[in-house]
């Protein structure tokens, strides 16, 4: 298994990815997150999690592991819909976009990501009625939200994340 990790992990981006399309490089590292959902109720659910990003495949892609509740939090705060998933983001020079796969237990999603202003928008490929948005991105924090398109064509936020770069 050690050889698998050595073959997968890479410590920098491949130079073929133009710097202006290196949207996800800022996320490489470990993040402490707060997941917030059930936004329609008076007391939304808040759960501590972790999000870990790394260059992989000789720097041609960025992979993450999304864990809510976090590994330590799971011991005390079990959630019936806990998520332990991974995303693989590969830059596509033909489209100047990122081709993305997200998978966790019971779900597999294909998305495409573009930068719009300062935000990174990942749109689900089949119906285009769900998207994820990274915003307010700095080297030490970012926000993320999951949105669904409603009947009138507007986007409703159904979940949010606040992320702080992990210390240590």
Give the residues covered by each predicted segment.
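Hydrophobic small-molecule pocket/channel-lining residues, especially in calycin-type beta-barrels
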Residues: 1-168
């Amino acid at each position: 298994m050690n050889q698998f990790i050595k073959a997968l992990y890479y410590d920098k981006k491949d130079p073929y990815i133009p710097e202006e399309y290196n949207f996800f490089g800022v996320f490489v590292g470990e993040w402490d997150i707060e997941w917030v959902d059930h936004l329609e109720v008076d007391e939304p659910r808040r759960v501590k999690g972790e999000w870990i990003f790394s260059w992989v495949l000789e720097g041609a892609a960025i992979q993450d592991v999304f864990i809510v509740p976090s590994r330590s939090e799971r011991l005390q705060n079990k959630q019936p819909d806990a998520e332990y998933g991974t995303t693989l983001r590969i830059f596509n020079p033909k489209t100047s976009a990122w081709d993305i796969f997200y998978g966790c237990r019971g779900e597999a999603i294909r998305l495409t990501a573009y930068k719009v202003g300062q935000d990174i928008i990942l749109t689900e490929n089949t119906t285009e009625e769900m998207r994820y948005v990274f915003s307010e991105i700095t080297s030490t924090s970012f926000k993320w939200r999951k949105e669904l398109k409603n009947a009138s064509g507007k986007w409703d936020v159904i979940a949010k994340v606040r992320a702080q770069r992990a210390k240590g």
